UniProtKB/Swiss-Prot annotation:
Positions with biased composition (Polar residues): 1-11, 19-36, 51-69, 94-118, 619-632
Gene this protein is translated from: lsd90
Sorted UniProt keywords: ATP-binding, Coiled coil, Nucleotide-binding
Superkingdom in the source lineage: Eukaryota
Record region (Disordered): 1-131, 224-244, 589-633, 657-757
Molecular function per GO: ATP binding
Protein's name according to its UniProt entry: Protein lsd90
Lineage: Eukaryota, Fungi, Dikarya, Ascomycota, Taphrinomycotina
Coiled coil: 166-604
Keyword Translocase: no
Length: 757
């Protein structure tokens, strides 16, 4: 059962992970699409636009368009990618370069300035790179048109969604989308305030119109004086009149082109809005699908839990049955074991009693045998002692007898020697007296007696010595035999003592066995009591009914499976219809864009001048007079949406919030703004103050990608590009309908033959 529950929980976790991963992948794809759109917008501005760093220091407006290069688009993309995971930020930029008319002699002295309103600054990238979050960038774009100049203003609202990898991801994403929409509405309100601020320039336009009327009156008076002048002046006046008509026609064409360009910008803005709505609809659809998959995974997990509960109920019923059987088998085994233990205990007790009796009998027999052997040894010792004593007495009597013979012989020896000496003396005297022969015979007998006596003494002495030696040897042997008999008697006595001691040990063992037998009998009695108690209380089956629990688990499983079927057969969400509506709106906007662009291409680039102006008061500026080499994006352009942190920090302290303010930026701010706007975002605010103005190496190129090509580069959203086949030269000619210096009114004054005073 535990394995089944673990498996179901594992499957549930895997399903939730797959759902979260699919939702994250969809959100990531949407974020990549939005990031790509933002990079295209920031790196590829539309025709007529230039970034905050497009103001040249040498006063040549021809460099205004060369600062925004295709090569810088990559840098802009890199900047966008580096700030893709920052905090939500908003930027409304209007780079209209319409400047109020100024009275001058010899040209214009001031250059166009650019101001930017910025939203929240990005957070530190370190805090947004946490491994516990998945960062998704959501970009919402709104396009509006300035009421005075007709310049489009693009509001880009960027929200960085920091998604946690858990089941609250979708809800957090929806809340962050609401935050992004709310910031877009706030940006729109700021745009309204910017328009109100720009309305103050209307009075300047009226003043310019009054000056134009006054200049027209002055021109009429001059024309009257010219008709009164010489014929050469009349020819010059007729030539100026012809040029004025041509310039008027050119101005009308420029106005038409400006109107079409405004419509084209509006169409491009509508396409961007449709793309944004399509992105939002696709994200909503992906979020709905992810939520649906999450609900399905949750319901499957609930079904797995119900199935596990059913299996658990069945398992508990089986466990209860098995428990009863186990207890019954254990009871039977315990009764049999108790019976066997009782029999074994009684048998062992009887064996121990028999062993104790045998030990007692063995102890008595051993003691009797030892005592008998000890008594026999003692009797044998006494017999041997008596025999030894009698034999010793015999040897002693023989020795005494020999000693007595020796003593009697030695005792009679002096008398015999004296007798022999007397006889020798007698013989000697007789010899001396009469018989020499007798003396010799007596001397011979004396010598013989000495020899015999010595031999007899030696023999007797040897006999005595031999008798003593024999007595000594016999005494020694008797002593050894006595010692051996004594040792045997001692051993017999020791055996008796050992037998007595052993009998004590045997007696203790016999008593221990008797005690063990008593304990075994008492144990057998307790076992008999336990056996009787077990037999009187056999195990009973558990009175638990598990069928109701199994039925409830089965009903819950059926109910959850029906809920899963309802979820699978549910109607598709409204987000699918919203996607279709957004796609139709995008197709309509692209069709309108194609229509306006074709009309604009048919009107742009009209060349109406046939002669050069010869008015003595022709416009002279400090800029090059070659109109074809100047930027044609002075009056109508798109704002750049990518700016460096350093330029933002430098302008936020010195410039007004919107374009058109009367406050002029200091030279330090100009130096900061003249840097390329596509610097990496890692540049700090301190570095902005020391940044020197450097022109990019690719500044020779004057080609700028228009909004149509930037919209068509977003191929992953299905946007149809309309300007891919246009060359750089055609895009340059597209901006040739307006004046390069200071907007449409300069063209009107030039066409009317008026000079700036």
């Amino acid at each position: 059962m535990v394995g089944t529950i673990n498996e179901s929980m594992q499957n549930m976790k895997i399903g939730a992970k797959e759902t979260a991963q699919s939702a994250k992948q969809g959100i990531k794809n949407a974020g990549q699409s939005s990031s790509k759109t933002a990079r295209d917008v920031m790196g590829n501005p539309v025709p007529g636009s230039y970034t905050a760093g497009n103001t040249a220091n040498d006063g040549d407006s021809s460099y205004a368009s060369s600062k925004n290069l295709p090569g810088n688009a990559d840098i802009g993309a890199t900047s966008s990618e580096r700030t893709a995971y920052a905090a939500p930020q908003r930027a409304a930029v209007d780079t209209s370069n319409v400047s109020p008319p100024s009275t001058q002699t010899g040209g214009y002295a001031s250059k166009d300035t650019t101001s930017t309103y910025e939203g929240a600054q990005p957070l530190s990238s370190q805090s947004s790179r946490s491994s516990n979050y998945t960062n998704v960038k959501i970009t919402a774009t709104q396009n509006n048109v300035d009421a005075l100049t007709g310049a489009p203003i693009r509001i880009v609202t960027t929200t960085n969604a920091r998604i946690q990898p858990d089941e609250k991801t979708l809800q957090d994403l929806l809340e962050q989308r609401q935050v992004a929409l709310r910031e877009a509405r706030e940006a729109e309100e700021e745009l309204q305030r910017a328009r109100q601020y720009n309305d103050r320039s209307t009075s300047e336009a009226l003043e310019l119109e009054a000056r134009a009327k006054k200049a027209a009156q002055d021109a009429e008076l001059a024309s009257e004086r010219a008709r009164e002048a010489q014929s050469s002046i009349e020819r010059s006046a007729s030539l100026r009149e012809k040029q004025a008509r041509e310039e008027a026609e050119r101005a009308a064409t420029a106005l038409r082109e400006a109107e079409l360009k405004h419509r084209l910008a509006q169409a491009n803005a509508d396409v961007d809005v449709a793309n944004s709505k399509l992105d939002i609809a696709l994200k909503n659809e992906a979020a709905w699908k992810a939520e649906r998959e999450s609900s399905l995974a949750h319901q499957k997990a609930v079904i797995d839990s119900a199935r596990a509960e059913l299996e658990r109920a069945r398992h508990e019923a089986a466990v209860a049955d098995a428990t009863y059987k186990k207890e019954h088998y254990e009871y039977n085994a315990l009764v049999a074991e108790l019976e066997e233990r009782n029999d074994n205990t009684l048998r062992t007790a009887s064996i121990r009693e028999a062993e104790a009796r045998n030990l007692e009998v063995h102890m008595e027999d051993t003691l009797k045998d030892a005592r008998m052997r000890s008594r026999n040894a003692t009797e044998q010792v006494e017999v041997v002692k008596r025999e030894i004593n009698s034999e010793i007495d015999v040897y002693r009597s023989s020795v005494e007898k020999t000693k007595a013979e020796l003593a009697s012989y030695q005792k009679g020896l002096p008398s015999q020697k004296e007798a022999c000496d007397r006889e020798l003396d007698d013989a000697t005297r007789a010899l001396q007296a009469a018989f020499q022969d007798r003396f010799n015979a007596a001397k011979l007998r004396v010598n013989q007696f000495d020899v015999d006596s010595r031999q007899q003494l030696a023999m007797l002495t040897k006999k005595v010595r031999d008798a003593e030696d024999a007595e000594e040897k016999y005494r020694i042997s008797c002593h050894q035999r006595e010692e051996e008999i004594t040792r045997c008697a001692t051993q017999a006595y020791d055996a008796v003592k050992a037998a007595e001691k052993r009998n004590e040990t045997i007696a203790e063992a016999a008593r221990a066995k008797e005690n063990e037998a008593k304990d075994l009998y008492s144990k057998a009695e307790s076992i008999t009591q336990d056996l009787n108690a077990k037999r009187s209380h056999p195990p009973q089956p558990a009175n638990l009914d598990y069928s109701s629990a199994i039925q409830r688990a089965q009903e819950r499983l059926t109910l959850e499976e029906s809920k899963l079927t309802d979820l699978r057969t549910a109607e598709p969400s409204q987000y699918v219809n919203d996607v279709e509506v957004a796609r139709r709106a995008l197709r309509d906007a692209q069709a309108e864009q194609s229509k306006v662009e074709s009309e604009y291409n048919s009107v742009k680039g009209s060349k109406l001048y046939t002669t050069e102006p010869v008015h003595p008061h022709a416009v002279t500026t400090n800029e090059p007079t070659d109109v074809s080499t100047k930027s044609k994006s002075a009056a109508y352009h798109y704002p750049a949406t990518t700016e460096t942190v350093s330029s933002k920090a430098a302008r936020s302290a010195t410039t007004p919030a919107y374009v058109g303010g009367a406050t002029k930026t200091p030279s330090t701010t100009k130096a900061v703004e003249s840097t390329p706007s596509t610097l990496p975002t890692s540049a700090s605010t301190n570095a902005a103050a020391t940044t020197t103005t450097k022109k990019p190496k690719a500044a020779k190129s004057t080609a700028v990608r228009d909004d149509v090509s930037s919209a068509s580069s977003d191929s992953d959203k299905g946007t149809t590009g309309l300007g891919k086949s246009e060359s750089k030269s055609s895009r340059k000619e597209r901006r040739s309908s307006t004046s390069s210096g200071h907007g449409l009114m300069n063209n009107v004054r030039h066409a009317l033959g008026m000079s700036n005073k």
